[in-house]
Amino acid sequence: MKRLALLAALTLLPTALAVTLYKSKASVPPAMPDLIVDQKRLLQNWVVRDEKLPASFCSVEEGGITPGEHALLRFTVSTPNIGTADLFVGDPNVHFANNDGLFEYATCHRHFHFRHYALYELVSVDTGTVWRAAKRGFCMIDVEKYQAYPGPSNNDRNYLACGAPATATEPAIPGNQGISVGWADTYVWKLGGQYFVLDGGDGQPVVPPGDYLIRITVNPPFVALNGEPCPNVDSHGLCHQLPESNYDNNVSFIQITIPDHPGKQGVGPLKNQPQLTAEPID
């Protein structure tokens, strides 16, 4: 009888093993990118100051800003990929030709703008009023290693080219956009559009002195307009341009105090930085 029981158990073993292996494989989630906003980087890199914005700056043209001296809040944004797979976008020339909704063309600096990549908001702590930043476009590349990444530290950067379309006299420049695992795409405070206009020079209401949140959302949700592509849908039915394993960790914010008269030297961690005479583009 014991032999029969043992034989029966051995007969069922392959089936049980197969079921166990199947369950094990089925429970492993697919490798996916996961974008966050580096709150520490934001906290350490902002300044409120008076600054001259000439008409030649593309951010002035694209943001509808009146040229001249303005009170600005400049800041740095870093968006690391802490997921298990690279965020691959590829060549914007191909996406633009396919009209898939990922990119639009900015004529000011012969540059593609990735749509719905990040949302910059300045929020009044007292009233909840929201102001938008001057930033209008983004190019995703591996700018710097994210030191807090919990995974392997020896992964390489793979995405280094924004790309540009052809002109009447110049050929197209192939791009290769994306963010490698453990790397971050970073937009430093000096770049075009990395600021809020505080004095109403961009057509928005004046930002009065007081306490505010700088709120950054990477890969923000949006409602697709009629005919607009919706590449990825979250659990709330909202669209996202990029696929991620987790859409719930895409927002970060810091609280700051905006003074009445910041002056040219400014107030904040980046005070006393030289005034800008040119506007680097990303």
Residue ranges and their predicted role:
Residues M1-L4:
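Positively charged n-region of N-terminal signal peptides that target proteins for export
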Residues L7-A16:
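Bacterial N-terminal signal peptides
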Residues V19-D282:
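Extracellular/luminal regions of secreted and cell-surface proteins that mediate adhesion/ECM remodeling
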